């Protein structure tokens, strides 16, 4: 029966299906579990069947980034009002930041790749899903009235802040992930209170820390330091 099923499954293969299975495998077992052979087994096909959709392991890893940004873009489309955000460019950047955070929460094992893999190739060779989000952000800023230099400054600041916050949040190593006591989970009980009184005093704060609220609050502070574009009302009015 398995031999009869395999050709049928091969016929249903597609790049989105292959990348979706790769994302699911990495979510469950980590990046170290991802091999062409293991992914083929997950899909019920021979390894060679995958090479039509991805030429090898490195390309497959890049495909994880592609799928990650596809998900961000899908989240943004699902929550789109169909035009300019009624509250302006800042509100749209906050909406993008939330979509980025939700995707990072869903796929924390892929997040470090998002911070490094796109930078390893020239801009024009990055996945279309990465370029689509970049274009959207730059278009938001352009419609708001930022000139080219201002748009790039805000874009780079926005991306750096989001990635930095999410990497600290999602990739923090803890002593015991299942431990409910934050002092024990983070290993802070090992620190002498006399030497590190402030760290020890902040232990209760770690228990109810809202990372997304901190990220958005910090983003607002960064954007407050940006000069308002001269055509800000243009974006608010939808360009009319």
Tell me the role of every PLM-derived stretch:
Residues 17, 25-59, 63:
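Helix-turn-helix
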Residues 17-24, 28-29, 59-78, 91, ...:
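Alpha-helical structural segments
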Residues 35, 112-115, 199-200, 235:
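Short, hydrophobic secondary-structure boundary micro-motifs
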Residues 74-122, 129-132:
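Hydrophobic alpha-helical connector segments
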Residues 119-145, 149-156, 168, 188-197:
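Amphipathic alpha-helical packing segments from all-alpha helical-bundle domains
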């Amino acid at each position: 029966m398995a031999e009869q099923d395999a050709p049928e499954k091969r016929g249903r293969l597609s790049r989105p299906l292959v990348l979706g299975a790769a994302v699911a495998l990495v979510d469950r077992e980590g990046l170290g579990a991802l091999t062409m052979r293991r992914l083929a087994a997950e899909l019920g096909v021979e390894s060679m069947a995958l090479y039509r959709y991805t030429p090898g392991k490195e390309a497959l890893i890049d495909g994880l980034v592609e799928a990650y940004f596809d998900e961000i873009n899908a989240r943004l489309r699902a929550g789109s009002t169909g035009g300019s955000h009624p509250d302006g460019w800042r509100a749209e950047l906050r909406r993008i930041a939330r979509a980025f955070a939700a995707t990072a929460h869903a796929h924390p094992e892929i997040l470090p790749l998002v911070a490094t893999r796109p930078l390893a190739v020239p801009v024009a060779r990055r996945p279309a899903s990465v370029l689509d989000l970049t274009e959207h952000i730059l278009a938001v800023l352009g419609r708001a009235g930022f000139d080219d230099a201002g748009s790039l400054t805000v874009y780079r600041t926005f991306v750096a802040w989001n990635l930095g916050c999410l990497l600290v949040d999602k990739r923090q190593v803890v002593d015991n992930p299942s431990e409910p006591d934050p002092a024990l989970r983070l290993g802070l009980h090992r620190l002498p209170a006399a030497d590190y009184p402030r760290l020890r005093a902040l232990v209760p704060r770690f228990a109810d820390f809202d990372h997304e609220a901190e990220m958005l609050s910090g983003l607002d502070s960064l954007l407050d330091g940006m000069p308002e574009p001269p055509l800000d009302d243009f974006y608010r009015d939808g360009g009319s």
